[in-house]
Amino acid sequence: KIVLVRHAKSSWELNVIDHERPLKEKGLKDAELMSKHLIQDKLSLDLVLSSDANRAKTTASIFMNNLNIENDKMQLDHNLYDFAGRNLLRVIKSCDVNVENLMIFGHNHALTSFVNTYGNKIIDNVPTCGVVILEFNIDRWEDLNKGTTLKTLFPKDLKNK
């Protein structure tokens, strides 16, 4: 199973390079809201991978804190600072066979492209802080093929309630 999370809403206001852009206040609130809502899913995770971009790392740390995921399960990977999706796929396929449940914090268009290619539900756009959970019937990540989209959860889903 893979839990894919797009980083929360980030700021363009500071004069910093793209990689260093921080989360906006809205992004911080969305990450809190979404991660607390996921507690009910009782996710059991073996590994958490995050892009090393500031906005993805911050989103990941909020989720990990609220979901009580141990810090030693997280790895930063510059290859996930990927917008096309080729590196995302490579990172997933190279995961150890002992990793059954994986959580990834990354970027668009890589995430939307991945969930549409490997899930069974078409999603126009995974929004900032959007979560998509996919399940696969495989023994090794390198054998990745079409899976099942188990869940989509976007910030607007929780705000409209």
PLM segments and residue spans:
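Active-site-proximal alpha-helix that buttresses catalytic centers in soluble enzyme cores
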Residues: 1-79, 121-129, 161
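Short glycine-/acidic-enriched loop or helix-start segments at secondary-structure transitions
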Residues: 14, 59-60, 86, 113-116
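Residue-level signal for well-ordered alpha-helical positions
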Residues: 62-63, 117, 137
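A polyampholytic, Gly/Pro-enriched intrinsically disordered region
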Residues: 93-103, 145-156
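Non-DNA-binding regulatory cores of transcription-related proteins
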Residues: 95-103, 108-130
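Domain-level recognition of soluble alpha/beta enzyme cores
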Residues: 121-155
